[in-house]
From Swiss-Prot:
Residues 1-21 form the signal peptide. It comes from Bos taurus (Bovine). This is Insulin-like 3. The modification Pyrrolidone carboxylic acid is found at residue 27. Disulfide bonds join 34-117, 46-130, 116-121. GO terms for cellular component: extracellular space. It comes from the Eukaryota. SUPFAM superfamilies: Insulin-like. It is found in: Secreted.
């Protein structure tokens, strides 16, 4: 039995299969991340003090509160409040009446947490939100 045709078929089809399957494996589907799931994914990806490595699978006590302290003053805090996660919601600061409409419109337009919750985010999207 002559194996030359089989060998040539593998030689010719091998690289074609590698090229065809390569980009599909590199692309990742966006994942919808809301509330504390968004924060945890961001911390795992970006890193953070103490609670970023949950190596044994157990969450660190008070982890959500520490996450909020880390995010204080960051552009993501408003996104967490807008996502409506009752565990993470802080009391919003009162705004003057005249600026409430503009603030809401601006927050909706540039709110990464809301975008990740509604449309989903890839790992690369989350990397752009890392502070360092």
């Amino acid at each position: 039995m002559d194996r030359r045709p089989l060998t040539w078929a593998l030689v010719l089809l091998g690289p074609a299969l590698a090229i065809a399957l390569g980009p599909a494996a590199a692309q990742e589907a966006p994942e919808k991340l809301c509330g504390h799931h968004f924060v945890r994914a961001l911390v795992r990806l970006c890193g953070g003090p103490r609670w970023s490595s949950e190596e044994d699978g157990r969450p660190v006590a008070g982890g959500d509160r520490e996450l909020l302290r880390w995010l204080e003053g960051q552009h993501l805090l408003h996104g967490l409040m807008a996502s409506g996660d009752p565990v993470l919601v802080l009391a919003p600061q009162p705004l003057p009446q005249a600026s409430r409409h503009h603030h809401h419109r601006r927050a909706t337009a540039i709110n990464p947490a809301r975008h990740c919750c509604l449309s989903g985010c890839t790992r690369q999207d989350l990397l752009t939100l890392c502070p360092h």
